[in-house]
């Protein structure tokens, strides 16, 4: 490779620049920007081998070319966005759109698409003819399959001009709503009863007083002989057949049987009930009628007045009503001592003593408890039946019984400053005192009745009470 040696001008510039650098380094002076540019150009020229004259010519050519470009530039009228859209749309789709537009324009110009009214009518007629020709023809029917005309003959039953023999009032009279002949007068003139109606009424009364033999036998078999009180007060056994056959028909305007004189208070005469039942149907307008066998059987089956029996109890001798009330009381008292109620019932907590007890009479004064019962012994039994309530028994009087929550009773006790004293007076003084507190007046309605305990359970409860008292006395 041939190495080109630098010229005298290049060596001078290089030497000058090295001298400047040495001067700047030795003195610490600052070179200007123009001087730095010249130094850099000299270095580039020295490396490329160009002279200063060539550099000047290149600069002149560069400036002249820039001027010519600026003079030759003219704005074009081409829409760049339209050209870009054309480039984005493929050529196939553009041809299809153009063809559609062209076909639409041709269709609008075609007279077949928009025909005249005459041509349109002809086209409609031609379509109808073509549809009729395309329909399949019906098959020819043979002689057997032909329709045969049938002329129906209607026969109407003739309407009879004869009036019905039974009148309208007769039907309503059978139902118990119509008027009977001879009982009422219309326009001041009494209607006489015919022989036919009299015989009919007589037969009805006989049927009602004398039931059938089979029915009487059934009554004798089921009920047997009955005691009938006589006028002298003696009881005479008599069967239902005799009493029904020998019963006289007494007329009674009120519809009730005549009162009995002497004899048993609860003795009852079956014939009297039959008479009252019969005459009540005869004399009243809408009473029970005896023309139907159903009512006749009811009259024969009527029983006497019911005696006052005691309250029915179960086999163990326990009244179920008291058991239900005790269950309600137990659930209500358990709610009073529940955590849910103690969180919000401050009135109940204010009446607790140091051990958490509350007088049972205080709970008995609540309206909810009074709606169930006011018996303290029943309340005591309800508390003992609960698993949540603890009972403190005081043998002096049932009014001093106290109850509390069995478990976790200590957190609910309030300080002594916020407590309320429950002054419980003796039971007789509550009713006699005129000036009493509202709480004492609510307790005045309490009753102390002996507990309802069956004989079989009485001994067991007494043993439990004695053992509890002995345990407390020993402690």
Swiss-Prot record:
Gene Ontology biological process terms from the UniProt entry: cytoplasmic translation; positive regulation of translation
Residue span, HTH La-type RNA-binding domain: 319-408
Residue ranges of the region described as Disordered: 42-292
Phosphoserine: modified positions: 410
Domain of life, per lineage: Eukaryota
Keyword Phosphoprotein appears in the UniProt entry: yes
UniProt-recorded Gene Ontology molecular function terms: RNA binding
Feature: compositional bias, Low complexity: 243-263
The keyword Phosphoprotein is annotated on this UniProt entry: yes
Compartments where found: Cytoplasm
Comp. bias (Polar residues): 150-159, 220-242
Biased composition (Basic and acidic residues): 59-72, 119-134
UniProtKB keywords: Cytoplasm, Phosphoprotein, RNA-binding
GO cellular component, one term: cytosol
InterPro entries, alphabetized: La_dom_prot, La_HTH, WH-like_DNA-bd_sf, WH_DNA-bd_sf
Phosphothreonine modifications at: 408
Feature: compositional bias, Basic residues: 277-289
Name listed for the protein in its UniProt record: Uncharacterized HTH La-type RNA-binding protein C1527.03
């Amino acid at each position: 490779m041939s190495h080109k040696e630098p010229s005298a001008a290049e060596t001078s510039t290089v030497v000058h620049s090295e001298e400047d650098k040495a001067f700047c380094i030795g003195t610490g002076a600052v070179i200007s920007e123009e001087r730095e540019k010249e130094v850099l150009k000299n270095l580039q020229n020295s490396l490329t081998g160009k002279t200063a004259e060539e550099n000047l010519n290149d600069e002149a050519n560069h400036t002249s070319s820039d001027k010519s470009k600026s003079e030759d530039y003219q704005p074009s009228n081409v829409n760049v966005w339209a050209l870009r859209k054309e480039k984005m749309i493929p050529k196939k789709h553009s041809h299809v759109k153009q063809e559609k537009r062209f076909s639409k324009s041709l269709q609008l110009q075609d007279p077949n698409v928009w025909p005249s009214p005459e041509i349109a009518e002809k086209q409609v007629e031609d379509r109808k003819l073509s549809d009729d020709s395309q329909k399949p023809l019906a098959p020819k029917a043979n002689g057997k399959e032909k329709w045969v005309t049938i002329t129906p003959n209607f026969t109407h039953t003739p309407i009879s001009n004869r009036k019905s023999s039974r009148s309208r009032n007769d039907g309503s009279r059978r139902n118990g709503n119509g008027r009977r002949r001879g009982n009422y007068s219309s326009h001041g003139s009494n209607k006489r009863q015919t022989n036919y109606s009299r015989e009919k009424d007589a037969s009805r009364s006989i049927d009602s007083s004398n039931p059938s033999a089979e029915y009487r036998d059934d009554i004798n078999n089921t009920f047997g002989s009955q005691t009938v009180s006589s006028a002298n007060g003696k009881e005479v056994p008599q069967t239902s057949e005799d009493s029904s056959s020998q019963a006289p028909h007494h007329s009674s305007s009120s519809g009730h049987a005549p009162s009995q004189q002497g004899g048993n208070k609860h003795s009852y005469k079956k014939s009297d009930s039959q008479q009252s039942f019969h005459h009540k149907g005869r004399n009243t307008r809408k009473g029970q009628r005896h023309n139907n066998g159903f009512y006749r059987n009811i009259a024969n089956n009527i029983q006497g007045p019911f005696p006052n029996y005691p309250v029915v109890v179960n086999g163990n001798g326990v009244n179920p009503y008291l058991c239900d009330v005790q269950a309600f009381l137990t659930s209500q008292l358990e709610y009073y001592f529940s955590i849910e109620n103690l969180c919000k019932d401050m009135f109940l907590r204010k009446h607790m003593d140091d051990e958490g007890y509350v007088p049972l009479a205080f709970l008995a004064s609540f309206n909810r408890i009074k709606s169930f019962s006011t018996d303290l012994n029943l309340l005591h039994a309800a508390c003992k039946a609960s698993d949540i309530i603890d009972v403190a028994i005081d043998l002096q009087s049932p009014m001093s019984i106290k109850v509390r929550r069995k478990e976790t009773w200590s957190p609910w006790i309030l300080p002594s400053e916020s407590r309320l004293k429950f002054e419980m007076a003796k039971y007789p003084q509550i009713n006699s005192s005129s000036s009493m507190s509202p709480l004492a007046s609510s307790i005045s309605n309490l009753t102390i009745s002996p507990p309802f305990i069956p004989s079989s359970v009485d001994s067991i409860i007494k043993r439990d009470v004695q053992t509890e008292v002995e345990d407390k006395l020993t402690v």
